[in-house]
UniProtKB/Swiss-Prot annotation:
Ubiquitous. GO terms for molecular function: NF-kappaB binding; ubiquitin protein ligase activity; ubiquitin-protein transferase activity; zinc ion binding. Zn(2+) 2 binds at C152, H154, C195, C198. It catalyses: S-ubiquitinyl-[E2 ubiquitin-conjugating enzyme]-L-cysteine + [acceptor protein]-L-lysine = [E2 ubiquitin-conjugating enzyme]-L-cysteine + N(6)-ubiquitinyl-[acceptor protein]-L-lysine. A zinc finger (RING-type) spans 134-199. SUPFAM superfamilies: RING/U-box, UBC-like. It comes from Mus musculus. Keywords: Cytoplasm, Metal-binding, Transferase, Ubl conjugation, Ubl conjugation pathway, Zinc, Zinc-finger. CDD domains: RING-H2_RNF25 (cd16470), RWD_RNF25 (cd23818). Ubiquitinated; autoubiquitinated. SMART domains: RING, RWD. The keyword Transferase applies. Belongs to the RNF25 family. This is E3 ubiquitin-protein ligase RNF25.
Amino acid sequence: MAASASTAAGEEDWVLPSEVEVLESIYLDELQVMKGNGRSPWEIFITLHPATAEVQDSQFVCFTLVLRIPVQYPHEVPQISIRNPRGLSDEQIHKISQALGHVAKEGLGTAMLYELIEKGKEILTDNNIPHGQCVICLYGFQEKEAFTKTPCYHYFHCHCLARYIQHMEQELTTQEQEQERQHVVTKQKAVGVQCPVCREPLVYDLASLKAAPEPQQPMELYQPSAESLRQQEELKLLYQRQQEKGGIIDLEAERNRYFISLQQPPAALEPESAVDVSREPQPPNALSAEQSTSLADQSTLPTSLPMTTQYTYEKTSGAGPNQQRPGETQKSVLDPPRHGRGSWRQYDRRHPKGGECCTPKGTSEIHELPPPEKPLKETVDLKAEPRNKGLTGHPQEKGPGSWQGPSARRTRDCARWERSKNRTPGSCYPHLPRGQGAYRSGTRREPLGLESEEGS
C-alpha cells in the first residue's frame, strides 16, 4: 500500500503529462503521443516544416522529430532522433541533431519539449533550400532560381519539370494511338505523368511551369591535371602495343570481313566486240561472200564424235533365263543411241510366242549385228542361250566375247528381251522327261527332276 501510494504521488508530481497536454493544444493533430507505463518511456512524434505562414508550396524541407522521454524526465535528457528527412543532406541532419542535443542539455531539470520542437522549426526555416541536384538536369539549386517541390517532396527546376511533363504527355498520347490502332483494350485506367524519382502521380500547372525562367548554370571548362595527362600517355602506349600484337579487335573490320559485294562495275567493251564506226558499209554481195567463206571454214574443222553415256547393268546370281554362276558378275553395255548406229537395219522389238529371239523385219534368218566403229566399253558380251524346247544335250560353253568375228553360237541383238505371259522364270531351261535322272551342265548344278511346261 505504501509503494502504490508513493507511485501515485510521484505521477501527480511528474510534469510530463501536463506538458504533453499543452503541446497537444498547440500543435493539434500534428503531435502524436505514445504513452508508456511506469517502466517504458513515452514517445512523441511530430513532423516539422519551415515557418512560411502556412504556404505549403514554399516549404521545401521537412523531417519527423521523435522524442523518447524517460521516466526520470526532466532530470534526464530525452533521446532525440530524426526520421524521414526531405531536402536535407546528411551533413545538415547531423548538425540539426547536435543543435537539438545542446538545447536539451541546457534545459536539463525543466520542461524542454516545446523548446526542442521550436528549435527544429527554426533550423528548417533557415535552411529552406533543398539540398542536392535536380534529377533532370543534374545541377544544384541556387537561391534565386525557380524550382518546385512535388507532394512527395522531390525537387526540380520549374523549367526542367515542364520539359519532362511535355515529353511524358507526348509519350502517353503515342501509346494511346498505338493501342487504338492495334485494337487493344486496356483494363487498367491510364496513369498520368508520374514523378521521375518515386513514380507517384504528379499534380502540376504546366502553364506556370513553362513561364518560369531557365536555370543559368555556369559552364565549367574541363582542364586535365598533370596526373590525368600522364595516365592518358600510358594508356595510349598500351593501346598501340596491343594493336601491334593483334589484341585490339576492330568491330567494323570484323563486320565486313566476310562481306561479299554484289555490285560490280560494268565491264568495258573489248576491242573485238566494239563496233568500228569508221568502217564503211559493204554491199550485200560482199556480205554473202563473207558468210559463205565462214561456213566453209567451219566445215573444215574436225567434227568430234558425239559423247554418249554408257549405261551398264550388273547381273547377279538368281533364277532367270541368263542365270550365271555364283560369285560371278557380268556387265553389259546397253545399246547406243540410234544416231550413232549408222545405216543399220531397224529390228522389230516384238517377241513371238515361244520365246524366239528377235529377228529383223521381213526376214526369217538370224543375223549377227555388225561391230561398231569403236567399242563404247570393253565389257563381256552377253550371249543369248538357245531356247529350243527339245534340247537334251549339254549346252555349249560360252566363249569370250569378241568383235573380231562370228561366235560359235548365235548372238542376240541389242534389243530388250521380254518374257511371255505364260512363262515362268524356270521354263527357259531344257527339261528332261520325268524319271530320266539329273541334268548336269558343266560345273553348274541344277535342281533334280525338272518338269517341262507341257507335261505333268
